Each structure stands twice: as structure tokens, then as C-alpha cells.
């Protein structure tokens, strides 16, 4: 007789090999055909909303690994919230204006932007932006990200631009928009002002020079201390040699001690506490202090500029520190924020001798036409000729660069439009406190940034963007902006988009009959556009407030930690300025992606990993699993080795799912499910372990701690299931009659585990869960066409049975000692497979009573026979002794013959005439099966 045919061997068409790169696109196609996004919305329609507002990625180039991680995290959250019963729409967006797209348009046209009309240039920019959106959209969808991909929000859409104009108008109405001459970050390469969020810092080697300014007027305070002023100098230090021609003052700290120190024949004035440092760095001779003054006592003195016949005023400033330099700060109001502010207090000119392209103008005699970096060498030579260069060295320091072209930037005073953060700073700081920040340090970080930030320079000297909606009187030059002009611009932008600004005259845009206070009716348009951070920072108004599926404020903003100074902040500022509160309730940040050694990814290191390559080789689900494999609030490491580890972890989860499916082929959940009360104790233990995972994972996900997923699910599949419960269960599943209560109890448990597990992994392993779901039989209440339409598992209180939990946890702990004893016996060649073993247990009285509470211990230990000895019975000397329990174990070869059907050794094999090669238990099971 072929006894294999009497066994309930596992069977399923669910493939062992995932083949994700091929299978995932098929699942994507199925989702699109069923319109899964709108079906999930319909399912939870009318329920409480959960809005994760998408921070728009820039529409330029392929997505990188960091962008992929960000989008996957968002998708996991939205899918989890949907399964929890929230109406959780996800409207993706794109940031579509700005310099990078202009640069691509210039490449496409093969000309300079000044050589074509703004309208023609903007059309090329728009076409390029749309091409990038379509490319990135396909890449995001391939990651398994679910969203309203057919209706994304774009910052170039007319409706969006009109709403942005409205935000600008509201801020202007409240007095928060002004035009001023101020030093701003300026990129000579891009010929435009930059916001703080557009600055990156890189190490750079620069000049480090000490320059002396001869004292011209000491206000009589040095009388009797020095013979004459011809050899008395204030000494400054700078790393920006090119700013020396713009020097108008020297700033001292009012409370610092300033020494007149004699170095040879000359007297240098500098902070007393910096003398030794300067002496060493400048390689000066020994000195003698001849007098000490407080900084405030030197205010109003005058020094002579070393290059020009003009004075440098000695002024006071609290910004002067002793961290570096001489304590005498070179002050050029046209080239520094603090220089500008302190210069305003003293009525200093805002001198800016540098043009838009970084070249000196005739305001710097002797250097006109020189590029500022090239001028460094010439200026140093002139300082030497003037005997004003005390010392020069080279220094490596962190220096600001343009985030787009990576060129060094400069501080340069120009007329720009600003948003007065000072006008609503306190409101913004208050709003920050009302938001939940994850991690919590995010609150302090953005608080410090907002508290310390300067006013926001919102104008850009470019073409591709939303124009600043301001007009100027042709006669008197006064700016014109009011409700009527804003409404007129808004209406036209809503109809025609912002191209209208470049296609229409001021007269065509403005309401009829509008006049300036001076009586003129002739106006011209502002030529600057808005900072792209104002674009994306207006999304809360342009998207959350206007989209029919969304609401304001958002429940969550989720971006990289660099967005504390970017989108989080620009959104906060525009929202507080116009609505008095933050546009989000919660803010979650993730770190950056680094390589396996923790290094930043770069072309020079060749350590970058393309998400497209990961998907092609491993599949999107592996990338999604990696996203939650570690604490993403810190920097995330990725490498081929790490991806292989993810693949192995994934395989364990998939194998567990396959085992569950393969043992449910003849199980109908509507007919064959047993009530909890009829399950075996070990089944109830398994459901307790499952329940614990549901509880812990739900708690973690609710706190945005998605990085607990891999540990919890992987441990459950590998430790609780594969290594323990499922291994023990095989005998009951395979050898018992197919419809027996014992097997149905096992299958009931497996079904609950599978149905729960597939839902738990659905937000993360979005493709694999869908594949598993399609192979499952479902009860009539849960026969959804997609797992994404199923609910998140609930914690079942009845599964938390303290008596069963404690009892079986202890037995499984003892089982570790049994396994150790079996391994020793296997090493000693006493047995091969554990089913060849008989285990004799010599317990204490307490453990004896404990073991008597179990039936069929041999199936739990996966051996053929267990003999429980009386407590007083002595164990043989060679017995294995437990370190943790009062217990000794002896392993010998089991008596009897091996059963051909169940493989256990039994003395009943050969005792049944009809079935001479199987044990009595198996014969009984076959008999019961034939009677069904």
C-alpha cells in the first residue's frame, strides 16, 4: 500500500521563488484595472479623515534612493491608516519651478536664457517639467505607492498658482512683505539670490589673512601711551580677502578687554585674550602690553582703510566673539548680515561693489572687471605693497555653496523682496509648540532655526516661476499692491496660468481705472519671481484647503530632516502669517541614506545605489522591507550586503506564508473553523503569540515606529512559527484524518495566523501580501478582491490566557534543554534524526507535577518516546543536567521499528496484520479516514 496517499501532505500553487521583479508589475496592472485607490477611498468614505500631505519632490531627474525611501514610508503610513478604518487619501505632488529646470531648458535650447523671450523659455521649462513628472510618476508607482496618480498637484497648475498669489496677497495685506536693500546669499553662477534652504556647506580651502588698519583718530585716548599714531594699528582677520575693498568699519565687543600690544616697532590693537593665538598663527615676535581698554572705550575712533583714502569707523557689536580672529571684526555692510545690521545702527553706507555675475564694479577702484575670486590675489599684493598685510595662511573651513550648481556663494547687498519673519516670529514659535514632532528633537531644531533666522528673501532673478504680483508706477516708482490688484492677478492666473504675466501688459492685467497716489495710470510689472520655497510652502493653502478629498491642517508632514529649514519651515511661515497656526498636527522626519560604512553617497566614491537597480534585481518589496529594517529617524545604511540580508529575511516570511497556505488547501473557513474553546492548548499558545505581535505592531505603527516591523514579524515567523509551532504541528497536520477535530483545530489556527499575518505585512510587503491574498480561501465576510480592502487585525482579548501562556512558555523553555541533550546524542552517534530518540526525563517533584499536565510530550519534543521518571528515581551518571531547571535528561535510541507512515519508532510496528510496516496509531488514523 502507498501510505503517502493516506497522508495530508502540503500542497499549494503559491511559488516558493518570489521572482518579484517579474511578478510585481503584474500585480500593479491588476491594481490599476480594479482602480484600487478609489476603492479604498470608497470603503472608508464618511469616516474620520487622515491626511498625510505629500511634500513635493523636485521634477528633475530620476528618483534616488532617499526619495524612494521617503515615498515608501508615506505609502506604508497611508495603507496602515486605511486598514485602520480612516479615510486616508494620498494626493502626490511635484515642485515644478526653479533653477534646475531652467538649467535643463538652457541645455535643451542650446542657448542662453536672455536670448529667447520669457514665454518661449518658459514653454521649454514647462515641457521639461512635465516629462520629468511622468518619468518619476512611473518610478513611484513601481515602488507600489498607492495614490491619486492621475490627479497629482503641481506647483505650475493655474489653480495652484492662483492660490499662491492669494497667500502672497494676504501676507502683503498684513504688512509682512517689503522691499529692502540687504545682504543676501547670492550665487554669481546662477545670477540670483538664494534662500537659506538653498545653501549647502562644503569644506573649502581659503585665504586666512591678518590686515592692519592704521589709527587715524584716537579721540585723544592714547595720549601718553604711544608717542604718535603712525605705528598704531587695529588688526582684523578675514577669510574673504575680496571683501576688503568694501570695508567701512571695524567692530569691537563693548565688554572685551582690548590690548595695545607692542610687536617690535609697531603697536597692534586686538582682544587681549586673542594675543597668544594670533602671535602663534601669524608667526609674530614676542609682545609687550602697553595698555588695556574696554571695547566700549574705543568706540568712535577712526582708522585708515589700507587700500583707499577713506576712514574705517570703530564701532561696537554684540556679535563679536573670541572664537577666532583678533576680536576686531572687519565690517563690510554690503557683504554680511551682521555687518549690515550693525552698520545700520551707525548709519554706514551699504556698499556693494560686486555685480550680479560676481565681478567688481567701479565702486571698487583698481579692481573693476575682476571676478571676485580672481581679485583675491591682486588685493593681497596691494595690501603687501601698502605694508598692511600682517600675515597670510590657508585655512580649510565649511563654506556655503549653491545647492543647484554647487558653486561657492557670496553675501551681497541687493534690493530684494522679503517676508518679514520678525513680524510674526513669536506666533511661529508658539505654533511650533502645538505640533507633535517625531523625533522629539525636531521641535528644538526648528525652534532654534525660526528664532534665529533673518527675514526671508523671497525674490529670485529668474524667469521660470510664479511672478511676484507687484506693479510699479512709471512716474514715481512706488510699488502698487492691494486687494484689487491681487484679485486681478489671481483671476487671470486661474484662467491662463502665470504665463499671462509675461504675455500681457500691466494695463491688461490691472483693473480698469486704477491709479497711483501720484495720479499716474501707467504701471510696469515686477520682473522677479518667487522663491520656489514659497511655491511649495503654499501647498497647505493650494492643496489641503482646495482639494475635495483633503482637509486643513494635515495630520502629518513626513520628509527628511533637512526640511526643518526647508518645506516644514516655509509651510509653517506662510501658514502662521496667513492663518495664525501650523498647517500640520504632526511632523515626522527621517535621516539620510548612507552606504554600508555610514558614508554619504557620492559619485566620487562610487557608492550610490539606484532604486531602479534594486527593483530590477530584488524587487520593490525588498526595498520596502529595507525601509523599515532600522530606525529611519537616523541615517539609514544600504549596501548590497544589507540588501542580501533583507532578501533572506523576506524569504523566511515568504516560506512561513507558503507553509500556512500549503496546509489549508482542504480548509473552508466558512465550514471548517472551530471555536477557540475547542482548540488544543498549543494552538491557543500560538494565537497568543500572534496576538502579541498584533498588539506590539499596532502600538509601534501608531507611534510612527515602523522600524519595529521587521523584528516583530521576522521573529514571529522564524522563532515562534517555523522553529517551534509549525514544526510541532506537522505530525498532526499530515498524519491525522483530514477532517479530524485535531487537524481542523490546527488548520483553524493556521488560517487565523495566515489571515492576520497577510494583513500585518500588507502596508510594507504590499506586493507579496497581495499575492498571498490571491491564493487564500476567504470566509464570506472577508472575501475582498484585494488585501488593501481588508481591515487591520484587532487584538483579541480571549487569546490572552495567562494560565496557558505561562504553562507553554515554560515547556518551550525546557524544550531547549531537550534539544541540547538530543544534539549531544547526535554528536555521539546515538541517534540521527530526533525521531530516532527516546527521551528519559528525571525531574524534581515540582517539574514532575508540571509535566503530568501535558499529553503527548513526544510530539512537542519531536521524538518517538518520552519516559517521565518518578522524582525519587536517580538518573544515570551520564545524564544531561539542565542549568536552569532541576532536571536531568537521558537520550537513547527509541525501541521498536520505524513507522513507514509517520517515521516515529514504535513497538507496535509489525503487530497489525493488515499494515505490517506502520504503527498502531497510523493504522487507527487510516481506519478513521476510510470511515468518513
Curated annotation (Swiss-Prot):
Cofactor(s), names only, from the UniProt record: Zn(2+)
Keyword field contains Disulfide bond: no
Entry's EC annotation: 6.1.1.5
Motif 'HIGH' region: positions: 57-67
UniProt comment concerning the protein's domains: IleRS has two distinct active sites: one for aminoacylation and one for editing. The misactivated valine is translocated from the active site to the editing site, which sterically excludes the correctly activated isoleucine. The single editing site contains two valyl binding pockets, one specific for each substrate (Val-AMP or Val-tRNA(Ile)).
Protein name: Isoleucine--tRNA ligase
Residues reported in the UniProt entry to bind L-isoleucyl-5'-AMP: 559
Residues given in the record as ATP binding sites: 603
Gene Ontology biological-process entries: isoleucyl-tRNA aminoacylation
Motif ('KMSKS' region): 600-604
CDD domains: Anticodon_Ia_Ile_BEm, IleRS_core
Highest classification ranks of the organism: Bacteria, Bacillati, Bacillota, Clostridia, Thermoanaerobacterales
Recorded catalytic activity of this chain's protein: tRNA(Ile) + L-isoleucine + ATP = L-isoleucyl-tRNA(Ile) + AMP + diphosphate
Location relative to the cell: Cytoplasm
Residues at which Zn(2+) binds: 899, 902, 919, 922
Self-association and partners: Monomer.
Family: Belongs to the class-I aminoacyl-tRNA synthetase family. IleS type 1 subfamily.
Species in which this protein is naturally found: Thermoanaerobacter pseudethanolicus (strain ATCC 33223 / 39E)
Co-factor binding details: Binds 1 zinc ion per subunit.
Keyword Transmembrane in record: no
